[in-house]
A protein has these predicted regions:
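Substrate-binding/access-modulating region of protease and related hydrolase catalytic domains
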Residues: 5, 96-204
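Subtilisin-like serine protease catalytic core
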Residues: 1-104, 121, 154, 158, ...
């Protein structure tokens, strides 16, 4: 999410730098984005008119606001703290981390953002400062392949993501060839796990 009322996201004329917000956490939406059937969408007109009801979830300590400012703060709040691209506008997706198909919703977010950027005729860099220890981490799962395809579909598209911030807590297993070996992994946090299998046909077992 994002605190779109922060001065660093408002230009010199008093208009928002946030072009769109898609809040995927809204359970009973009244305005879902085109091509998607969940979450609530607002545009810059809604924000400027004061009818956007999106709230940056306090449970995530303003994380979305922080990373948005690092990317595109115009420095209005203090005239000293600027983002990497202070003249850039923002398209924000508030992720639902409790979704049963969280990675799928991330791929939806990528499609949504690139589509909106295309409609404005602008290049686009997507920042995903989030991650998971689940999955293969080899870029071959369906959601990763979908994101890769979206990114490569047109020029002027880029995507950056967090490389991990677990520090010395190695809560993941590094993959290697098991064709002639046995792997034993102890999972610290759960008494049971579900391991999906991906067939070449695309089926998930």
């Amino acid at each position: 999410g994002i605190d779109f009322t922060h001065p660093d996201f408002i230009d010199s004329l008093g208009n928002t730098k946030v072009m769109y917000i898609w809040d995927q956490t809204i359970g009973s939406p009244t305005n879902t984005p085109a091509n998607f059937s969940y979450g609530e969408e607002w545009d810059s007109t809604d924000i400027n008119l004061g009818v956007c009801t999106h709230v940056d979830p306090s449970s995530y300590y303003g994380h979305g606001t922080n990373v948005s400012a690092m990317a595109a703060s115009n420095g209005n709040a203090t005239n000293s703290h600027y983002g990497a691209a202070p003249d850039a506008n923002l398209i924000v997706v508030a992720s639902n981390f409790n979704s049963a198909n969280w990675l799928g919703t991330i791929a939806d977010a990528v499609e949504y953002i690139y589509s909106k950027a295309d409609s404005m005729g602008l290049p686009c860099v997507i920042n995903i400062s989030a991650g998971t220890y689940g999955g293969s981490h080899d870029g071959l799962d369906l959601d990763a392949l979908r994101i890769d395809s979206l990114m490569k579909a047109k020029t002027g598209r880029a995507l950056v993501c967090a490389a991990g911030n677990a520090g010395s807590h190695a809560a993941f297993h590094l993959g290697y060839d098991l064709s002639a070996d046995t792997s034993f992994t102890w999972f610290e946090f759960n008494s049971s796990i579900v391991i999906p299998g991906y067939a070449p046909s695309g089926c998930v077992y």
